[in-house]
């Protein structure tokens, strides 16, 4: 018969957790999948306007969900001892997104469009919660990795290759994913009240 010791969190940690939970409980969030389908800045602003009208507090914007539809001005990445030029990464991501779904309305939002959108949302009192999915829902990123010369980035399950999931045993693919997400996280840092970072 084993006795389990009960360990209580320090009062400060418990109080902080309660404050965070209370704040999150007051959130009313609308989620838009702007990764699978392209949404123009005007469409997103209209969604923000409607969200405000209906009492929402935040817009959860999936820019990386199968497709990757947000491009920074500088997309250069250093992964280990390899540097990928910005234009090469942009072209590979754009091609990867088009391979997932070549949306006739557009491919991606630019950095200036996103910065403007964040400012617009803030002025309306709407927070922006950006998301780039990993290790799954990465179709465009996996295709981009292959175009950039990373071999076999896709997870393989008994001979069946996943179109969406990175192989967590492929160190180069994992490092590339982390570098890409770090790049986006650095851009969004301080621009969003809830900074979440998907890590592999």
Located regions from the model:
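Active-site mouth loops of central-metabolism enzymes
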Residues: 29-43, 164-172
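Conserved beta-strand positions
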Residues: 32, 61, 195-197
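Aromatic- and acidic-residue-enriched carbohydrate-binding clefts of CAZyme catalytic domains
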Residues: 23, 66-122, 138-172, 200
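Acidic, proline-/serine-/threonine-rich low-complexity intrinsically disordered repeat tracts
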Residues: 2-19
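N-terminal small/glycine-rich loop or linker at the start of catalytic domains
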Residues: 16-35
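Catalytic domains of carbohydrate-active enzymes, especially glycoside hydrolases
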Residues: 43-66
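An active-site-proximal structural segment forming one wall of the substrate-binding cleft
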Residues: 56, 114-135, 163-194
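Active-site beta-loop-alpha junctions enriched in small/polar residues
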Residues: 35-37, 64-66, 133-137, 198-200
């Amino acid at each position: 018969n084993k006795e389990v010791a009960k360990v209580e969190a320090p009062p400060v940690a418990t109080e902080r957790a309660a404050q965070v939970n209370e704040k999150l409980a007051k959130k009313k969030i609308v989620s838009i999948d702007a990764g699978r389908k392209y949404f123009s800045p005007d469409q997103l602003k209209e969604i923000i306007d409607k969200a405000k009208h209906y009492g929402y507090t935040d817009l959860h914007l999936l820019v990386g969900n199968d497709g990757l539809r947000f491009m920074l001005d500088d997309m250069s990445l250093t992964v280990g001892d390899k540097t990928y030029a910005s234009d090469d990464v942009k072209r590979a991501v754009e091609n990867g997104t088009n391979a997932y779904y070549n949306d006739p309305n557009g491919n991606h939002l630019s950095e200036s469009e996103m910065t403007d959108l964040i400012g617009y949302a803030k002025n309306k009192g709407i927070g922006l919660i950006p998301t780039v999915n990993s290790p799954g829902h990465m179709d465009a990123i996996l295709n981009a990795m292959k175009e950039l010369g990373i071999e076999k980035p896709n997870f393989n399950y008994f001979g069946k290759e996943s179109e969406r999931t990175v192989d967590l045993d492929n160190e180069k693919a994992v490092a590339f994913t982390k570098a890409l997400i770090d790049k986006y996280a650095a851009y969004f840092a301080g621009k969003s009240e809830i900074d979440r970072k998907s890590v592999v």
